[in-house]
Amino acid sequence: IARDSQAARDAVAEATSEGAWTNRPVQEKAPHGSKINAFFEGGRVMNLRNKKGDGLIYAIRAGDIDDKALMSAVTVEELADFFLYAKAINERACSAISKKTGTLATVTTVNDLAGVDLLGDASFRNALSAASKRGDAYFPGLSGPTVLLNLPRLLGALVKLFTPLFPESVRAKLRFDRFPLGDAGALSTESG
């Protein structure tokens, strides 16, 4: 994690060096970014400030990502490293927001599952899960709620059945809803 944290520090410093955020340095310094970045273009993975400006939204449109092609280009560990780096970037951004606002800034993670093939290869989900577990250990105060949008019907029924069995600390951070996000611009900063 030290390597990812240092890379994140360097990337954020470069991304903000001219007084406004420039994403290119963050993407260029991402571990395995040369193999991964193209799969996340076009609004498939986005970081946004929330409406209040006191936290971040990290949105993943999983159904729009060609996970089979992505996972043929990288290993689960490489993708997990990439996602962990993204968490380190979010930690740096939340730290700056916290200093500015005087309150703890967190990241709300939004997973849009529209179009996700639950019966396909689990490698992509395994990489997300590995990065999430490591990220929660390295950045314990960073995670805010997790919003799962557009769950496939069967999964939605199972989640409703098993959610009461989750610990209260987990249930407090989960949100489920059906919401058509439309095109990638639906989560742009112009739309709020």
Which sequence ranges carry the predicted segments?
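Basic, amphipathic alpha-helical/coil surface patches used to engage anionic, phosphate-bearing ligands
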Residues: 1-192
